[in-house]
A protein has these predicted regions:
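Membrane-proximal lumenal/periplasmic loop motifs of glycosylation machinery
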Residues: 1-4, 8-51, 55-66, 109
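Perimembrane helix-loop-helix junctions
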Residues: 164-192, 196
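Transmembrane-helix motifs of polytopic, lipid-linked glycan transferases
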Residues: 63-84, 122
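Specific aromatic-rich, kink-prone transmembrane helix
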Residues: 115-135, 146-151, 168-169
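Aromatic- and kink-enriched transmembrane "portal" helix at the membrane-lumen/periplasm boundary
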Residues: 35-39, 54, 58-62, 94-118, ...
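Short hydrophobic alpha-helices at membrane interfaces in multi-pass membrane enzymes
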Residues: 88-91, 133-152, 182-186
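Membrane-proximal stem/loop segments at transmembrane-domain junctions that anchor or position
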Residues: 205-267
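Membrane-interface alpha helices of multi-pass inner-membrane proteins
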Residues: 143-158, 169-171, 188-194
Length: 267
């Protein structure tokens, strides 16, 4: 239903009813889900309208995302050669990602998680290369530019992506402080370009964007909290009062689903 809400925003003028939150916003776009994803998904469906079928636009998107995901997975398998992983293991992994049904099924979905997954694979490979070279890889301007772009895409394609990037960036800055200037650029540049400059420039061009709920960025923590409260009864009264300030405990426990965090985080 996330993609449904995003497409609804793209094609419907303000005010916009956001079904997940049960709220009407006096804006065409809401950043409850990444606006970058909303613009991409909507553009492909719009392109489908131009050629006479929304299905064609969605099919083209699925095709390109499948190719992008396949390329990311293939690159990661090739990178294992650089790490000295034996060829039989590399080939086995390649075969696994090629024939394990959930992977292609996930890759063809028009949703933020599928797009983020492919981006994150590439980001993670770049991160490992920095660790492998003990920070020296950032000395290459080309590599640094690629890392900044991949970091930015992590930030743009999924709300928790910024947390992953910041935490890992601080680790690099502390561990490889010998290259502190490069690691500082690798940390600051994506934040300036994609967390601040992108919204400042793009949001006014599309008519402004309303702020959504904070729970989208904190979904994992909501899910973990609800799981703990369901499985344990040792939370103190003080802890429960603190939790109640950010989530409805009874609703979260009632809606809790072990497979996805949406029911808990929307409580």
């Amino acid at each position: 239903w996330d993609t449904y809400n995003q497409l609804y925003q793209f094609f419907t003028p303000a005010p916009t009813y956001y079904s997940t939150m049960g709220t009407v916003f006096d804006a065409e776009y809401i950043d409850h889900h990444p606006v970058f994803d909303t613009l991409i998904f909507g553009s492909f469906v719009w392109l489908g309208n131009v050629v006479g079928s929304q299905n064609m636009g969605m099919f083209l998107y699925a095709l390109l995302q499948c190719a992008f995901t396949a390329a990311a997975l293939s690159l990661s398998c090739c990178y294992l050669d650089k790490l000295g992983v034996p060829k039989p293991i590399r080939l086995s992994l390649l075969v696994f990602v090629a024939i394990f049904p959930p992977i292609p099924n996930w890759a063809m979905c028009m949703c933020k998680d599928s797009l983020f997954s492919a981006v994150f694979i590439l980001y993670f490979v770049a991160f490992i290369e920095i660790v492998r070279t003990k920070g020296a890889a950032l000395g290459s301007k080309r590599f640094l530019a690629c890392y900044v772009i991949l970091s930015g895409l992590c930030i743009l394609t999924k709300k928790p992506g910024v947390y992953i990037f910041i935490l890992s960036g601080f680790v690099l800055l502390v561990v490889y402080r010998r290259f502190w200037k490069r690691t500082l650029v690798a940390l600051i540049a994506p934040l300036l370009l994609f967390s601040f400059a992108f919204p400042a420039v793009v949001y006014p061009l599309i008519g402004g964007v309303a702020s959504g709920g904070k729970q989208e960025m904190l979904g994992t923590f909501f899910q973990q909290t609800a799981t703990y409260l369901l499985e344990h009864d040792d939370a103190t009264a003080e802890e429960l009062e603190t939790i109640k300030k950010v989530m409805n405990i009874d609703a979260a426990k009632e809606r809790w689903n072990p497979q996805i965090s949406d029911p808990a985080k929307n409580s």
